[in-house]
UniProtKB/Swiss-Prot annotation:
Primary gene name: addA
Name of the protein this chain belongs to: ATP-dependent helicase/nuclease subunit A
Function: The heterodimer acts as both an ATP-dependent DNA helicase and an ATP-dependent, dual-direction single-stranded exonuclease. Recognizes the chi site generating a DNA molecule suitable for the initiation of homologous recombination. The AddA nuclease domain is required for chi fragment generation; this subunit has the helicase and 3' -> 5' nuclease activities.
InterPro entries from the UniProt entry: AddA (IPR014152), DNA_helicase_UvrD-like_C (IPR014017), DNA_helicase_UvrD/REP (IPR000212), P-loop_NTPase (IPR027417), PDDEXK-like_dom_sf (IPR011604), PDDEXK_AddAB-type (IPR038726), Restrct_endonuc-II-like (IPR011335), UvrD-like_ATP-bd (IPR014016)
Chain positions recorded as ATP binding sites: A33, A34, A35, G36, S37, G38, K39, T40
Amino acid sequence: MIENWPKKPEGSQWTDDQWKAVVANGRDILVAAAAGSGKTAVLVERIIKKIINEENPVDVDRLLVVTFTNAAAQEMKNRIGEALEKVLIDEPGSQHVRKQLSLLNKASISTIHSFCLQVIRGYYYMLDVDPRFRIANQTENELLKEEVLDDILEEEYGIEDNTIFFELVDRYTSDRSDDDLQRMILALHTESRAHPNPEKWLDKLVEAYDVEGKTIEDLVYASYLLEDVKFQLETAEQHIRKATELAMLPDGPAPRIETLQADLALFGTLSAAARESWTSVYEAMQNVSWQTLKRIKKSDYNEDIVKQVDSLRNKAKDEVKKLQEELFSRRPESFLRDFQDMHPVLEKLVQLVKVFTERFQAMKRDKGMVDFTDLEHFCLQILSEQSEDGEMKPSAVALQYRNKFAEVLVDEYQDTNFVQESIIKFVTKDSESEGNLFMVGDVKQSIYRFRLAEPGLFLGKYKRFTQEGLGGGMKIDLAKNFRSRHEVLAGTNFIFKQIMGEEVGEIDYDADAELKLGASYPEGEDVAAELLCIQQTEEVIDGEEGAEVEKAQLEARLMAQRIKAMVDSGYEVYDRKTDSMRPVQYRDFVILLRSMPWAPQIMEELKLQGIPVYADLATGYFEATEVNIMMNVFRVIDNPMQDIPLAAVLRSPIVGLNDEELATLRAHGKKGSFYEVMSSFLKGAPLEEEKELHDKLEWFYNLLQGWREFARQQSLSDLIWKVYGETGYYDFVGGLPAGKQRQANLRVLYDRARQYEATSFRGLFRFLRFIERILERGDDMGTARALGEQEDVVRIMTIHKSKGLEFPVVFVAGLGRRFNTQDLMKRFLLHKDFGFGSQFIDPRKRIKYTTLSQLAIKRKMKMELIAEEMRVLYVALTRAKEKLILIGTVKDATKEMEKWLDAREHSEWLLPDHVRAGASCYLDWIAPSLYRHRDSEMLLELGQGSIPDEIYGYDTSWKVEVVDGNTLLAPEPVQEEKQELLEALREKKAVPLESERKEEVYDRLMWKYRYGEATSHRAKQSVTEIKRNYQSEEGSDNAFIKKLRAPIRTRPRFMEKKGLTYAERGTAVHAVMQHVDLKKPITVEVLQEQIAGMVNKELLTFEQAEEIAVEKVISFFDSDLGKRVLAAKSVEREVPFTMMLAAEEAYQDWQGKSGESILVQGVIDCMIEEEDGITLIDFKTDTIEGKFPGGFEQAKPILEERYKVQLSLYAKALEKSLQHPVKEKCLYFFDGNHVIKVEE
């Protein structure tokens, strides 16, 4: 009970609501945690309190903590570990706390998929699945689906008298392909798998079309649309009421009033019918008749008011006309006939989906693979069984988990789906009033509906639970925001109090939902939120595409100007670490976009202004010239009859034909493919002037034949390396600008092929299809780049990527871009509640029209899209800590402002439903909201009017401005002073310096650098160099300590007889340890075969291969450490890293400025992840035996001391990047098979 909960300690940092969330117990608890409210800290504190509870302590492995990402799970473990270590400092003798620390790595703190995997691994025998299964690659999964579906459809086409199937094909495919039908089957399969019982959902979908003995009033689609009809009639009626008010003004068109009142009476009739039934509305719509407006002499009245009255009435009439045409032009029974006609076709479609699901599951089972939806469904299958009434109930395994888990805690609960909810339900107590489920989230930040997240689960509980938790679950609101300034919070509240409601938005933005100030900031200048609306220029080329390009350019230019001005002026932001204000830096800025198409243009504009910028574009890899050329080579190897790829290869540096030579070749055979023409040309004797062309083509033709033969017999990865080597293309691109990057791109292609070969597919043709599917899904890979915390750049990212992050200054751009409604335009629509909806198509009569189900689903999806976009906007606005700047571009600002002002004097906080539901972009919500605030008066010059005081005078500060696009694109004027200097230079005259700045020029010329000490130390160091800095002078000549890596190259002839150097031998051994296949047996024969392969791939020279002592490599894998490598969960080898390190740590003699950092780079030989943590291994090939009189025991402390700094830096790099401690650091010496565990 509540009275038994621990009281909040005196002076506690926790708010009352946070403390309640930490200690509340005895029932299911839902914590609605607003942005920046410290939910993770609360969650960690709750777990700690449970673990160290004096009366009833809970072991950490008796808690199930479900997070949204693996990174969040690791962060949670780290925080819990740090908190337990602090407790241990106060209670060093506590065996319980020590036990919890030892249990932490085994605790169930993970994503839902990791928990599912744990359940499946433990109870795989209850499923028809190989316990050695692997997680399928997404593209591999797509290709498997394609294969299975092709086989099913081919069978169906081959069945005689398959009438219903061919009816399905006629209705939903084109003359050219059945792609649309395939998309339907796959979409239905995917949607069904988002439900706990996929088959049951599919059956309900068919049942909805069985209308035998039903009237239209019985249909769920009609019931939903009837609510929408009421909404639209109400909107239209509001237009007439507004028109009537205007007509009644002193200079309004009074003769219009009689007609407008008749219109109101008509809407009264229609609305009454809508409250009765569909049939009533249908009949009322047939009798709609509009009175003709009386003629008036417009000069007798205010012309603007007359126009407004007439426009409002026309809008109302258009709303009714739209309803008549869409819904009430057909008799109710005709809609029922559509359902009857489509029922058998839909039944066949669902049957195909079920067959597909069954065969797809079987194929995955045969290949020993599962996907992420399988993990959820397999877990659910283990945790549930069917009751007598056909419903799902907990299985014996589920009951075991219920007994095991004292509490289940779910983070980001708003992003849970139906299947995940069922899994959680089966491992927690049944009763909400006595439950053990603790859920944390913010439904206002639920932005993953496209991943089938279901915010309705959160909303349902939020409405059902009470703050007292009496008779059911308890809800706790964490509304205090500890992230942002008052100006950001009040600005966000002001907008969302007006746009987010239950009818439109799915959530009431009431007093409980409002953000409340929790952070304290010093007084700041220019902290008001801003809305900058850009008026596009008048002349736009290239239609809509050109307009989009210009919008991006305008917004980028404006943001660049603002960022530069803020940095140059020393705009200050608060630094919590120093508890003081400091000048803003580039890394304090972020530009948020709904999606990334504008990002390249924004980056380009910022770079032109000298602003460092970064965006993870994740595109461009396959567009890179070197990758594109190689992909064309592989397309030609697969099928040389493809003209475009072959022409591209012939024209590339690989063959090197110029345009004239290509034309000459084509002239030799105007018919047939390029390949046929090339083959024919090579058979004849060339003319003298064609000899060079002949030689080029003959060289390439012979290579191509060899590659095609090799591709049929050898692995794809070997083929790729063979092509790289025989063409010399890999070395060629290395000599081009950005050569290292180009070679890295080619290595990535090789790695992709290796990954592909690890799947169930083989062969070049399928690999090319594999890549095509990656591109079709839009999964092109960008160049990887790791950003350090200290990198001073402006970041550009999507709003989705920004979730959970915070920045001092936030620009939200592209607010005038239209919402993406493409999903609503599809030929068929799917919905979790309403099932399937498509056009009615009669191929015989060649007619098609919209059905009732399609209209209902489209309307429902539109309202859900509106709600999702509101939540996305909320996430964007709540990322800002100190300054929020909103930017959008419109084509005609005057016209848009008229529209936005339409609801300005609305008497309630919440804007009218039709204004919010009718929005096509974010500006359609933001601008009407801000135009009701006093801070927009300088722009509007309209006065308060009848806007309520609490809205007009709301405690928030805004700057609202319309920016002329022409001024942004105009070139910047050259300053007069600069112009004079330029003129003097052009005429080769002496530059005038008799000015106020003469002394400044002298001072600059005589200036000495303040931090001269820093110039004598390098800003970038390798780990090896730092290690040498720490070595004493006496020991610096011990060559056996030094570890050198050299590039792989053949030794010059004059050195051949001298044998390999120590460094070259070390490099060779390291190369073998990097590339040895750990999945194969480690034997002499296998290793020798792999070393030979490395020589073929030019990873080793012949000389190096001969020097490798294979038995020493085997000795390592026979050692305890080597066996741990083979048994590890994961093994990473030759891991490069860079990190920032305090200069004092790198240089013992550092005398420079405190706080300076240097960039450290290095390569970690090997790291292994085991159940209880990470171990770091560094391989050494130095000669030790015979070097020390006392043997290895004498050498050990010397070697350990010499390498301690090096391994400490490696460990620090790993811990920073992985956010996970390194448990052990090992040196392995091949000479003598020795292991040294390096301690701090």
